[in-house]
């Protein structure tokens, strides 16, 4: 999952990035986290926004604040889930103006990030099939639409995916049946 964090404070970006990485490790999700330090910089990165599946925005940033950034991004990407993150509770109602998916306070991120991510991932995945296999590399969850192709090499099958390649020792017809039933 491609996640963007936009916050002008490097310590806050690192804290959130670490919490998300810990969550991904605990729940067996793989996140590609990209960080930006300004709303202006983020709005210029169209290819990153097109690939983004979840955006965390600090509200109180210099120059272009998180609310203005969210408004600009939502104009082009209305379905992109945006989580507003701030140290100030008085901004909570402003989140409704930009149709934010969530509002998180920085001082209790560690306590709220898991529930937030559980809910957001469930919403994002509602229309995507998740497959779980025991590969040579370990048990890995994949989105069906992330599989590019499967190739047979000797006694194993190799999955070529957006995440990389994974090997499994199963017959191809067994894999076909599993994929049909998932």
What label would you give each PLM region?
Residues 24-38, 45:
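Short hydrophobic/Thr-rich beta-strand motif most characteristic of the beta2 strand and flanking loop
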Residues 1-21, 55:
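Conserved acidic segment of CheY-like receiver
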Residues 44-45, 49-126:
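CheY-like receiver
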Residues 115-182:
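Conserved binding/recognition cores within well-folded domains
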Residues 37, 105-106, 170:
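Short loop/edge segments at beta-strand edges and connector loops
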């Amino acid at each position: 999952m491609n996640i963007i964090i936009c916050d002008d404070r490097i310590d806050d970006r690192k804290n959130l990035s670490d919490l998300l990485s810990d969550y991904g490790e605990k729940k067996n999700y793989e996140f590609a986290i990209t960080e930006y330090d300004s709303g202006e910089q983020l709005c210029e990165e169209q290819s990153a926004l097109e690939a983004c599946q979840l955006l965390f925005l600090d509200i109180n940033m210099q120059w272009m604040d998180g609310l203005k950034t969210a408004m600009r991004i939502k104009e082009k990407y209305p379905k992109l889930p945006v989580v507003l993150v701030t140290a100030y509770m008085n901004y909570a109602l402003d989140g409704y103006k930009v149709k934010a998916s969530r509002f998180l306070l920085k001082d209790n991120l560690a306590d709220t990030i898991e529930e937030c991510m559980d809910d957001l991932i469930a919403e994002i995945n509602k229309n995507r099939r998740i497959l779980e296999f025991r590969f040579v590399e370990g048990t890995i969850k994949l989105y069906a639409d992330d599989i590019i192709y499967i190739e047979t090499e000797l006694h194993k099958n190799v999955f070529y995916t957006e995440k990389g390649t994974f090997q499994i020792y199963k017959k191809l017809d067994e894999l076909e049946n599993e994929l049909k039933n998932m």
